[in-house]
Amino acid sequence: MPHRSRHKKGRSSSVRPPHPTVPTWIQYTPEEVEQLAVELARRGFPPSQIGIILRDQYGIPLVKPITGKKLTKILEEHGIKQELPEDLLNLIRRALRIRKHLEEHPKDMASRRGLQLVESKIHRLIKYYKRVGKIPQDFVYNPEALSHLAT
């Protein structure tokens, strides 16, 4: 499937199984997987990084088939909740980086166009997250107010 706002086609990648089952070679119990995830989150890793660490260092391919819950749900149950979803937060950080670049290089039209594309993705995601209830209905994307997220 082609990418939105790009002239290139999408890239092929490995396909995840349609009905993932718990592999027989996994030696961790669901409680141990939850504890590992919570420990990594307390050390400051976002959910995507936690999944990669569990896959690469602990040999846990997917959390949901083992525990029956998604990783973000596990973290919420243990009191670790993000104020914004991770994908939206990453897009906001990217937009803030581009804005900072444009302050120093105001005639960089390619970056200005990139900022438009990133901010349109942000607005689409905000509409979706408001609809499903992941962010409050009165949330407004304001780059100046969200500048504390740039770190």
From Swiss-Prot:
Q: Which UniProt keywords apply?
A: Ribonucleoprotein, Ribosomal protein
Could you name the domain of life of the organism this protein comes from?
Archaea
One biological process term from GO is: translation
Coiled-coil stretches are none
PANTHER family on file: RIBOSOMAL PROTEIN S15P/S13E, SMALL RIBOSOMAL SUBUNIT PROTEIN US15
Q: Which family does it belong to?
A: Belongs to the universal ribosomal protein uS15 family.
- Give the record's subunit note: Part of the 30S ribosomal subunit.
> Can you say what this protein is called?
Small ribosomal subunit protein uS15
